[in-house]
């Protein structure tokens, strides 16, 4: 048995080295010990229209008697299209039991994206522009989640009345929490306007590991002194209801002028309701650590906060 595991481990290491050599920076190590990896796959166009992130975990039985545990991360990939792609990957495994199949999986996904890009329907960029044009007359800032990027970078649409550009605020990173191979980590920044929210998200996604997280849930609360109201919003990023729960926690703690992003790297084992507990615990811990639960104004000043800008108020969620 030990010899079998040793052989599987050697074959896995050889395949991992080969994937890193072939795909370079597109191949990302999420957890080297748990053997969790991801790769960003595009349709091979100079300006990619469709992209997808394949996340895999290699069990000890792979490639001998078990397939990789995988997840397809792309907000646009749903329903029948997702089922068909998953079926094609499973067919590759069934035809190659006992063999290394990661390369075949990646290229199969790439072929599917290339075929999709050749269809005449508008790509995600065109669809997003149409949606923005429909709400162009609204005054409130709007959070857009472009479906074309599987590593989830957001493009915040800012109204014409938004404040002048603010500098990037400092970003703090909390201690990670790991449970059954899933890892959660919170990131915090003081913010006083939507432009800073945008800058913080962009800066976080420059980090390849954060960008490849299965979910990046976030919420922010900005106090508008002139109106004595809050500008606040949240994003689930595929983890249903997680953003709203995070925002509710921030409301209960009565924090102001701060945003929290919680990254989750899925480890292949479902956690059930425990995942929400870990998300909120990560957020609470970093808010307490940075003193936002005591005196939000003084805490923000310790980060070098600027004077509150007068943003338009967005409806609470």
Curated annotation (Swiss-Prot):
Matches recorded under PROSITE patterns: RWD, UPF0029
Ranges of biased composition (kind: Acidic residues): 132-141
Record-linked InterPro entries: Impact, Impact_N, Impact_N_sf, Ribosomal_Su5_D2-typ_SF, RWD_dom, UBQ-conjugating_enzyme/RWD, UPF0029_Impact_CS
SUPFAM superfamilies named among the record's database cross-references: Ribosomal protein S5 domain 2-like (SSF54211), UBC-like (SSF54495)
Residues annotated with Phosphoserine modification: 295
RWD domain mapped to chain residues: 14-116
Keywords: Actin-binding, Cytoplasm, Differentiation, Neurogenesis, Phosphoprotein, Repressor, Stress response, Translation regulation
Residue ranges, annotated region (Disordered): 117-151, 295-317
Keyword hit for Transmembrane: no
Keyword Phosphoprotein assigned: yes
GO molecular function terms listed in the Swiss-Prot or TrEMBL record: actin binding; protein sequestering activity; ribosome binding
GO biological process: cellular response to amino acid starvation; GCN2-mediated signaling; intracellular signal transduction; negative regulation of transcription by RNA polymerase II; neuron projection extension; positive regulation of neuron differentiation; regulation of cytoplasmic translational initiation in response to stress; regulation of translational initiation
Coiled-coil ranges from the UniProt annotation: none
Cellular compartment(s): Cytoplasm
Subunit-structure text: Interacts with GCN1; prevents the interaction of GCN1 with EIF2AK4/GCN2 and inhibits EIF2AK4/GCN2 kinase activity. Interaction with RPL39; this interaction occurs in a GCN1-independent manner. Associates with ribosomes; this interaction occurs in a GCN1-independent manner. Associates with actin; this interaction occurs in a GCN1-independent manner.
Function per UniProt: Translational regulator that ensures constant high levels of translation upon a variety of stress conditions, such as amino acid starvation, UV-C irradiation, proteasome inhibitor treatment and glucose deprivation. Plays a role as a negative regulator of the EIF2AK4/GCN2 kinase activity; impairs GCN1-mediated EIF2AK4/GCN2 activation, and hence EIF2AK4/GCN2-mediated eIF-2-alpha phosphorylation and subsequent down-regulation of protein synthesis.
UniProt similarity note: Belongs to the IMPACT family.
Designated name of the protein: Protein IMPACT
Organism: Rattus norvegicus (Rat)
Lineage per the UniProt record: Eukaryota, Metazoa, Chordata, Craniata, Vertebrata
